[in-house]
A protein has these predicted regions:
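Multi-pass membrane proteins that catalyze or facilitate reactions on polyprenyl-/lipid-phosphate substrates
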Residues: 1-277
Length: 277
């Protein structure tokens, strides 16, 4: 793999992972355009590293929340050991519970992960999925904004958002787009919908990386390419952080319409180019 390819894929991963335009779909398109599909597909180990790069971006952007949850996790263990029940439950502890429940639907989908991976080779599916993502974003802009935060959101709310995240395993369906849209439909405050979507991505990305790392070990890791891979990781982390900041700004304005139009254009273009090819 060349440095240029690593930079391009890192940039695509960092931007598309957090903006609601589907990183899996755009990576598949980029791989197709760069002619590195099929037998010479992007190495699993590089895929793992790219996702770790975007995970660094989430930690950098939401470190205060993550730190509070880590502290509250150990405080909660102490409360259990001493049979204490805080009333009310601290917001950070509620957030931990919401994230755990929101992650559960992914476990149901684990047996089908190879099926979803194969869908990434189908440009017709990806083009259609991008159009669907655009529709979801367009509709989410027209949903009445709720007021729920971690203090008032229910476990059922978190489960519904988690189902949206599980559906986004389909390449071309944006994970952030699905989770933010699901959050808006369940009555989340727009800023909290975005924050919860990113925090919910942490166990999802870690879990996916564990499974992909196993595949990488089975197929063999080319350690001589690691320096090139690390270039892509840095690009993914930096562009990912910038994307998070941009999406938070857009959330403050309450408009995702531009992303919807982009997804429609990208989806139609993908379908047209695939047909012509």
């Amino acid at each position: 793999m060349s440095v240029l390819t690593a930079v391009v894929l890192g940039l695509v991963q960092g931007i598309a992972e957090f903006l609601p335009i589907s990183s899996s779909g755009h990576l598949a398109i980029a791989e197709h355009l760069l002619s590195i599909q099929g037998a010479s597909n992007v190495p699993d180990f590089f895929d793992v590293l790219l996702h770790l790069g975007t995970l660094v971006a989430v930690f950098a952007a939401y470190w205060d929340d993550i730190r509070d949850m880590i502290v509250e996790f150990f405080t909660g263990i102490g409360d259990l050991a001493h049979h204490r029940t805080p009333n009310p439950v601290p917001p950070a502890r509620r957030l931990i519970l919401l994230i755990i429940v929101g992650t559960l639907p992914l476990f149901v989908m684990v047996p089908f992960r190879r099926f979803f991976t194969k869908l990434g080779d189908n440009m017709y599916f990806i083009g259609g999925a991008l159009i669907v993502t655009g529709i979801l974003l367009f509709v989410s802009d027209r949903v009445r904004h709720g007021r729920k935060t971690e203090k008032t959101a229910t476990l059922l709310d978190a489960l519904l958002v988690g189902i949206g995240q599980a559906i986004a395993l389909c390449p071309g369906i944006s994970r952030s787009g699905m989770t933010i849209t699901a959050g808006c439909f369940t009555g989340f405050e727009r800023k909290f919908a975005v924050r919860f979507a990113f925090l919910l991505s942490i166990p999802a990305v870690l879990g996916a990386n564990i499974l992909t790392l196993k595949d990488a070990i089975d197929t063999g890791i080319d350690f001589s390419s690691v320096p090139v891979y690390l270039v892509g990781v840095v690009v993914a982390a930096v562009s990912g952080y910038a994307s998070i900041r941009l999406l938070r700004y857009v959330a403050d304005k309450g408009r995702f319409g531009a992303f919807a139009y982009y997804c429609w254009a990208a989806g139609v273009l993908t379908l047209v180019l695939t047909i012509l090819h």
